[in-house]
Amino acid sequence: MLLAIEQGNTNTLFAVHDGERWIAQWRAATDSTRTADEYAVWLSQLLSMAGLALGAFDGCIISSVVPQSIFNLRNLSRRYLHVEPLVIGENAELGIPIRIDKPSEAGADRLVNAIGAHIAYPGPLIVIDSGTATTFDVIAADGGFEGGVIAPGINLSMEALHTAAAKLPRVAIQKPQKVVGTDTVGAMQAGVFWGYIALIEGLIARIKAERDEPLTVVATGGVASLFHGATAAIDKFDPDLTIRGMLEIWRRNQAKA
């Protein structure tokens, strides 16, 4: 069995693949101070509830955008799973061209998404990943990563309003029925949600104009479901895109071993 650990700035996903399908997934708040031992206690309890155990794994793959956490995640795999993990950005061969000025700066999540999208959809593509930050990445027809755009995430935008403006409350994000709000909460929700839709549509249009080629737009990430039905600019919503990419990277590296 394979344990895939996909760590973003806000949440960390632990997913179990039995060789045929994903059989379990759990999320935890990302905490860079959590030790390998703490991860093991938490994970072993969840595995036990699913009829599994830490010792059942013969592989582990890690994708993290939090460098200070990788040490502890690696030790979790070594100490408790008794396997050497495959770490995106360190010892994992991706098998795709990275056509940007500084390839070492490309985030692990963006590269994993590129692979997950390329094997599922005909390219070229724009992959939108909505999390703490929202990324718009261009994937060539041959699967090459060609760069993209990084913007603040929708939750970060709403939190910035509350933090920087003394009289604005902390507000939950939801899709308003109208653009013009008639109270403070409604106005904030409309501004952030519909403003974000405008950002998505505007950046997609500009990327397509700059590339001058047809591009399929695929959205993933923790808050991508918020945008479903709110814009025609997104062609596909794919919540499993990232772990699909991780599984493909694992298989490619196993084939070379």
From Swiss-Prot:
<comment type="similarity">
    <text>Belongs to the type III pantothenate kinase family.</text>
</comment>
<dbReference type="Pfam" id="PF03309">
    <property type="entry name" value="Pan_kinase"/>
</dbReference>
<protein>
    <recommendedName>
        <fullName>Type III pantothenate kinase</fullName>
        <ecNumber>2.7.1.33</ecNumber>
    </recommendedName>
</protein>
<keyword id="KW-0808">Transferase</keyword>
<comment type="pathway">
    <text>Cofactor biosynthesis; coenzyme A biosynthesis; CoA from (R)-pantothenate: step 1/5.</text>
</comment>
<dbReference type="GO" id="GO:0015937">
    <property type="term" value="P:coenzyme A biosynthetic process"/>
</dbReference>
<feature type="binding site">
    <location>
        <position position="132"/>
    </location>
    <ligand>
        <name>ATP</name>
    </ligand>
</feature>
<keyword id="KW-0173">Coenzyme A biosynthesis</keyword>
<dbReference type="InterPro" id="IPR004619">
    <property type="entry name" value="Type_III_PanK"/>
</dbReference>
<dbReference type="GO" id="GO:0046872">
    <property type="term" value="F:metal ion binding"/>
</dbReference>
<keyword id="KW-0067">ATP-binding</keyword>
<feature type="binding site">
    <location>
        <position position="184"/>
    </location>
    <ligand>
        <name>substrate</name>
    </ligand>
</feature>
<keyword id="KW-0547">Nucleotide-binding</keyword>
<dbReference type="InterPro" id="IPR043129">
    <property type="entry name" value="ATPase_NBD"/>
</dbReference>
<feature type="binding site">
    <location>
        <position position="129"/>
    </location>
    <ligand>
        <name>K(+)</name>
    </ligand>
</feature>
<dbReference type="GO" id="GO:0005524">
    <property type="term" value="F:ATP binding"/>
</dbReference>
<keyword id="KW-0479">Metal-binding</keyword>
<comment type="subunit">
    <text>Homodimer.</text>
</comment>
<keyword id="KW-0418">Kinase</keyword>
<comment type="function">
    <text>Catalyzes the phosphorylation of pantothenate (Pan), the first step in CoA biosynthesis.</text>
</comment>
<keyword id="KW-0963">Cytoplasm</keyword>
<dbReference type="GO" id="GO:0004594">
    <property type="term" value="F:pantothenate kinase activity"/>
</dbReference>
<keyword id="KW-0630">Potassium</keyword>
<feature type="active site" description="Proton acceptor">
    <location>
        <position position="109"/>
    </location>
</feature>
<dbReference type="GO" id="GO:0005737">
    <property type="term" value="C:cytoplasm"/>
</dbReference>
<feature type="binding site">
    <location>
        <begin position="6"/>
        <end position="13"/>
    </location>
    <ligand>
        <name>ATP</name>
    </ligand>
</feature>
<feature type="binding site">
    <location>
        <begin position="107"/>
        <end position="110"/>
    </location>
    <ligand>
        <name>substrate</name>
    </ligand>
</feature>
